Amino acid sequence: MPRKYIITDIDGVVLDWEEGFSVWMEHHGHQLVEGYQFKYNIGERYGMTYEAGSKLVKQFNESAAIGFLPPLRDAQYYVKVLHEKHQYKFVALTSLSLDPYAKELRTRNLKKLMGEAFEKVICLDTGADKDEDLEALSKIKKYAGAWWIEDKPANLLAGSKQGFKGILMEHGHNMHKKVDGYVAKNWEDIYQHVIAEDKGTVKYER
């Protein structure tokens, strides 16, 4: 059977970055504002400037804490099922950091939680756009037409433009956005959608 691929963002899709960052920020004396769950920008979530928020995100992403993030929702179970039962391999495309130690911690974190599911981990600069890397991946024959999972609508669209099949992981900050792709509340939704398409019975419903 030919190998099947899922290209995926990590933070907010596979790993619960928000939980880890929230604990780290609280430890450093920062508090979330009311209604934070509906805001994507970290500065707005903590009542600070965009620049200050971005600086703290980079600091967190390059700290030891980044190697110990928990799985998001039911990701651990269904990623393993897709890999072990249905022969899917995963490629991580994450705007984490260019720091090599951060990449090593991310790779170890994923392996500890997801076993051998991830074939490759691609780390971009903190908060970087993914357009160029998605275009490059689309030109690699084995990845052509793969699934593409994101929580940021703009990145989902960038992948769809390269022929990937988009799935948006729903959060408070994106739940009212219109996207070109399936919207999932958890990995069980993703699993059911992917397997349904494998069987030719896929339905596109929000």
Which positions does each model-derived feature cover?
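Substrate-recognition element of Asp-dependent hydrolases with the DxDx(T/V) motif
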Residues: 66-71, 75-110
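Metal-dependent phosphoesterase signature
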Residues: 31-32, 39-80, 86
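Short acidic-hydrophobic, aromatic-tinged amphipathic segments that line or gate anion-handling sites
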Residues: 122-126, 181-193
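Substrate-recognition "cap/lid" segment bordering the active-site pocket of phosphatases
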Residues: 93-147, 153-156
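Acidic, Mg2+-coordinating phosphoryl-transfer loop and its flanking beta/alpha structural elements
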Residues: 143, 147-185
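Anion (oxyanion) recognition and catalysis
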Residues: 26, 83-84, 160
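Active-site neighborhood of HAD-like aspartate-dependent phosphohydrolases
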Residues: 1-52
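Short catalytic/ligand-binding loop motif for oxyanion handling, primarily in non-cytosolic enzymes
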Residues: 15-17, 23, 90, 99-103, ...
